[in-house]
Amino acid sequence: MTDTQNRVAMGYIKGVFGIKGWLKIAANTEYSDSLLDYPEWHLVKDGKTISVTLEAGKVVNSELQVKFEGINDRDLAFSLHGYTIEIPREAFAPTEEDEYYWTDLVGMTVVNKDHTVLGKVSNLMETGANDVLMIDGEHGQILIPFVSQYIETVDTGSKIITADWGLDY
């Protein structure tokens, strides 16, 4: 697996703040400040990758703002506008038992108890009550709540999720 395949997109640079190189970040994480846990970021745009080191970060009015080492003025900061933020997957904190990062579930094959392939997880969505697997396959799109009532096993090694779910649900 290459270095780029081991990285996960976590947000993007949406703008600049002030004149000293601070950047505004749109985080695609549950908590935007969780990006501050990762000192090394990879910025990707148009096939170009830049590795940067986080110098400082803060949340201001629910907005994540960061400063990178060596980015000390507004013009240099603005040149990073639109870059996607990627973090190496191996930098993620370990999960508890029966907890998963969404990025690890996307792409997994979902089968039911009859061993019928329902499709692959294309995405997940939050509903407030629980997360829902969005599965795409030859049976169309299937939505399955990601709760123990319907999800029997998640085998991250073989990338298979077994669900108590029929095609007629």
Curated annotation (Swiss-Prot):
Domain (PRC barrel) ranges: 97-169
GO molecular function (one): ribosome binding
GO terms, biological process: ribosomal small subunit biogenesis; rRNA processing
GO cellular component: cytoplasm; ribosome
Domain of life: Bacteria
Pfam family, one: RimM
Cellular localization per UniProt: Cytoplasm
Gene3D superfamilies: PRC-barrel domain (2.30.30.240), RimM (2.40.30.60)
Chief location of this protein within or outside the cell: cytoplasm
Assembly behavior: Binds ribosomal protein uS19.
Family: Belongs to the RimM family.
Domain remarks in the Swiss-Prot or TrEMBL record: The PRC barrel domain binds ribosomal protein uS19.
Function of the molecule: An accessory protein needed during the final step in the assembly of 30S ribosomal subunit, possibly for assembly of the head region. Essential for efficient processing of 16S rRNA. May be needed both before and after RbfA during the maturation of 16S rRNA. It has affinity for free ribosomal 30S subunits but not for 70S ribosomes.
Protein name per UniProt: Ribosome maturation factor RimM
Taxonomic path: Bacteria, Pseudomonadati, Pseudomonadota, Betaproteobacteria, Neisseriales
Gene, per the UniProt record: rimM
